[in-house]
A protein has these predicted regions:
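Catalytic active-site module of serine/aspartate enzymes centered on a nucleophile-bearing elbow/loop
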Residues: 213-229
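Active-site-adjacent alpha-helix of alpha/beta-hydrolase-fold enzymes
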Residues: 126-193, 208-215
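A conserved short beta-strand
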Residues: 92-104, 118-119
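Alpha-helical scaffolding within the catalytic cores
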Residues: 4-9, 103-112, 177-185
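Histidine-bearing beta->alpha loop at or near hydrolase active sites
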Residues: 201-205
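Serine-hydrolase catalytic machinery in alpha/beta-hydrolase-like enzymes
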Residues: 1-72, 76, 81-89, 114, ...
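Short beta-strand/loop motif that positions the catalytic acidic residue
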Residues: 122-124
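Short, proline-enriched alpha-helix->beta-strand connector loops that line the catalytic pocket
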Residues: 115-120, 190-194
Length: 229
């Protein structure tokens, strides 16, 4: 997926006045570009994409006079995994993340506890066969063992002690009638929240919207980031 062309973020930058960067990953031996988040078949790779993302962000902040405390990350699939990877670093520079079809690898995260409070938004299809909802702890798909969606959410919910929760049934996605459930966890202490958009019968894709036909998924993500600046 060419996220810069199809996600809808570019139009939003013009409307709301923020900067969107679309970094390209390194090409692997299979001819596919990737961000190095610890997949099994990239275990010999020395690519440091955390350093790359940090340096890219620092340059944009300096050159464009941006707010260094208002840096966010989103992406789909490997890009979603990279968003989690950035957020799970010992000293993350991102303020909030919004992965689509993302996950966290088991290796290195067995006892994961977030080091920085931030809000997290995940969009995930229940029938995703690439980044499986229930994960792949036995590494059947050869990506490397990774956690299921609910387990990933639990890292952040428990790490931030978010005790309040609710589930809201949203309107169907008009284009294909898929149903969406929004899971939300939060606290009365601050504005930290974790959102999970569960797309029933959803596949491995970037949905057009999340139940509001007039609001794109990109616009929902921007709204999430905007209120957590």
């Amino acid at each position: 997926m060419k996220i810069h062309a199809s996600s809808g973020f570019t139009a939003l930058t013009e409307e709301h006045g923020f900067v969107a960067a679309y970094p390209q990953g390194t090409m692997d031996a299979r001819g596919n570009t990737f961000f190095n988040v610890g997949y099994e078949f990239h275990k010999e790779s020395k690519v440091d994409d955390v350093k790359f993302a940090n340096e890219l962000t620092s340059k944009l902040v300096k050159d464009l006079a941006l707010d260094p405390d208002a840096v966010f990350s989103t992406g789909m699939s490997n890009g979603g995994d990279m968003s989690y990877f950035l957020a799970s670093q010992p000293d993350p520079f991102v303020r909030s993340i919004a992965p689509v079809a993302g996950t966290m690898m088991v290796s290195g995260n067995e006892s994961f506890v977030p080091k920085k409070r931030m809000s997290v938004m995940e969009v995930h299809g229940r029938d995703d066969t690439i980044t499986r909802w229930n994960g792949d702890l036995k590494n059947r798909d050869s990506w490397g063992a990774y956690y299921g969606t609910e387990a990933v959410m639990r890292f952040w919910i428990d790490g931030f002690s978010l005790k309040k929760s609710e589930i809201t049934r949203l309107k169907n996605i008009p284009s294909d009638r898929k149903q969406i459930q929004l899971h939300r966890w939060w606290t009365a202490i601050d504005d930290t929240e974790v959102l999970l958009y569960e797309i029933l019968k959803g596949k491995h894709s970037w949905p057009d919207n999340l139940g509001r036909q007039e609001v794109s998924t990109a616009a929902e993500i921007w709204s999430f980031f905007d209120r957590h600046r």
